[in-house]
Amino acid sequence: MQIITEPCQMQAVVEKLRLNRQLIGVVMTMGALHEGHLSLIKQARSLAGTVILTIFVNPKQFGPDEDFHRYPRPFELDASHAKAAGVDYLFAPSPEAIYPEGFQTTVQTGAVAEGLEGMKRPGHFNGVATVVTKLLLITKPHIALFGEKDAQQLAVINRLVRDLNLDVRIIGAPIVREENGLAVSSRNIYLSKEQRESATVLFRGILHAEKELAAGRTDLAGIAGEIERMIAGEPECRPDYVCFVHDNDFMTAETAEPAGEYRLLIAAYAGTVRLIDNRRFTT
């Protein structure tokens, strides 16, 4: 595995790979690799001849009161995991390499990014869209894999690729969960034993929605309210939002229609750690 830190060097490498007709897959991360990331690498390995992993803690997607400086950066361990997983190139640029002095251009997102995470974290998705665009232009992949845990982010990236005619196929990969149902996340390391146990309420909320929809309920807002109360009833947790949206545009859905496609989105705090989860439902 080769570690590359300069964008120009990465671009030169992928140019040669493309000339040699190598199918390139990329997995973008902020490091602190976990089983979810490793599953993305494994899937990329099965689909592409060359796998690039990017590690970049993007300052432009963190708000002023968020955990940018606290975000875990175990680079040596990440590199070891990446090599063992079969990564060919690890691209780990510095913030100065991605955003050099005088950097001015940003990608502005649209309606799909306005609600939920976009409302709670102003500017977050513009930061995501900007860095994803840059990393796609630098790594020039044929396929790029992203986890479905960040469902709204995936929707933003899909819209970005369509709107800008970027020549890459975006693949969403299923959420990887711990044995207790908690969605795997780099931030889970901050959870105490008690908080980790309470945080399973997010998955229990999803199972509640699954049960109610299977029984024929259509009042999505009512189900969301029940899940919000479940979270509020946990001693270590408090809800941020619980909402059903139309899966194609992330607009709020109050009532389920026949043959509708919806996504339940949950954000909550366990202590000071913000967690998200989701599931897609077809009625």
UniProtKB/Swiss-Prot annotation:
Positions of the catalytic residues: H37 (proton donor)
Any Pfam family the entry gives: Pantoate_ligase
Protein's job: Catalyzes the condensation of pantoate with beta-alanine in an ATP-dependent reaction via a pantoyl-adenylate intermediate.
Catalysed transformations (reactions): (R)-pantoate + beta-alanine + ATP = (R)-pantothenate + AMP + diphosphate + H(+)
Extent of the signal sequence: none
The organism's place on the tree of life at top rank: Bacteria
Similarity field: Belongs to the pantothenate synthetase family.
UniProt-recorded Gene Ontology molecular function terms: ATP binding; pantoate-beta-alanine ligase activity
Pathway(s) of this molecule: Cofactor biosynthesis; (R)-pantothenate biosynthesis; (R)-pantothenate from (R)-pantoate and beta-alanine: step 1/1
Taxonomic source organism: Chlorobium limicola (strain DSM 245 / NBRC 103803 / 6330)
Protein residues bound to beta-alanine: Q61
Other comment: The reaction proceeds by a bi uni uni bi ping pong mechanism.
InterPro entries to which the protein is assigned, alphabetical: Cyt_trans-like, Pantoate_ligase, Pantoate_ligase_C, Rossmann-like_a/b/a_fold
Keywords noted in UniProt: ATP-binding, Cytoplasm, Ligase, Nucleotide-binding, Pantothenate biosynthesis
Location of the protein in the cell: Cytoplasm
The enzyme's E.C. designation: 6.3.2.1
Name of this chain's protein: Pantothenate synthetase
Main location: cytoplasm
Binding site for ATP: 30-37, 147-150, 176, 184-187
Residues noted as binding (R)-pantoate in the record, renumbered to the chain: Q61, Q153
Gene3D superfamilies (UniProt xref): HUPs, Pantoate-beta-alanine ligase, C-terminal domain
A single cellular component GO annotation: cytosol
GO BP annotations, alphabetical order: pantothenate biosynthetic process
Top-level class of the enzyme under EC nomenclature: ligase
Subunit structure, as described in the record: Homodimer.
